[in-house]
Amino acid sequence: MAWQGLAAEFLQVPAVTRAYTAACVLTTAAVQLELLSPFQLYFNPHLVFRKFQVWRLVTNFLFFGPLGFSFFFNMLFVFRYCRMLEEGSFRGRTADFVFMFLFGGVLMTLLGLLGSLFFLGQALMAMLVYVWSRRSPRVRVNFFGLLTFQAPFLPWALMGFSLLLGNSILVDLLGIAVGHIYYFLEDVFPNQPGGKRLLQTPGFLKLLLDAPAEDPNYLPLPEEQPGPHLPPPQQ
């Protein structure tokens, strides 16, 4: 019964958050069970473009390291802030949310080439947190019961925490930079004098992922209208 309740609760999670979180957990579980090796997952441009191992363009965003404190810490923030974005500013805009993932992933991959970064999942997490924090500037965040501050400081607090754990902050900086580029192009520049929205979600994504817009001129059939329905007249 507990598993059924947990499964039912998980199915209530928005689709993109559910899919990405599940993919990360399953990838890590496969590595832990030695079904996969991290060497099969990391981003390597030579193997991608010369050996056509194109799955590495995706799998490097799914592996957050072996099971341990760092993995659960990252999964907590991925799940929480991905869900808050999907249920908040991207509510009813699944295609736009997926496009943000694609835009961020492509830009991180290109910039990651300069720094020889092999796994970019943590950068994607930092991007999600950054975009949420800029769209929720008045929200106060309690950081593990130790500090309370305004949401825009959260990405920097996470970067400092990574530094305390002995991790490189280059990945966090990359995620923050890409998150800022997305936020500027999507939320800031279109509202400037002479500005316009430069990021346009492709139509095929909207067709696949978003519910069709309702036609304001559509008149439902009598049997589709609310209220009691009279039986058709006898012939």
Swiss-Prot record:
One GO CC annotation: endoplasmic reticulum membrane
Tissue specificity remark: Unlike DERL1 and DERL2, restricted to several tissues. Expressed at high levels in placenta, pancreas, spleen and small intestine.
Topology relative to the membrane: Multi-pass membrane protein
Principal localisation: endoplasmic reticulum
Gene that encodes it: DERL3
Purpose: Functional component of endoplasmic reticulum-associated degradation (ERAD) for misfolded lumenal glycoproteins, but not that of misfolded nonglycoproteins. May act by forming a channel that allows the retrotranslocation of misfolded glycoproteins into the cytosol where they are ubiquitinated and degraded by the proteasome. May mediate the interaction between VCP and the misfolded glycoproteins.
Positions of region (Disordered): 216-235
Transmembrane region(s): 23-43, 59-79, 99-119, 158-178
Annotated localization: Endoplasmic reticulum membrane
Keyword Endoplasmic reticulum: yes
Biased composition (Pro residues): 223-235
Official protein name in the record: Derlin-3
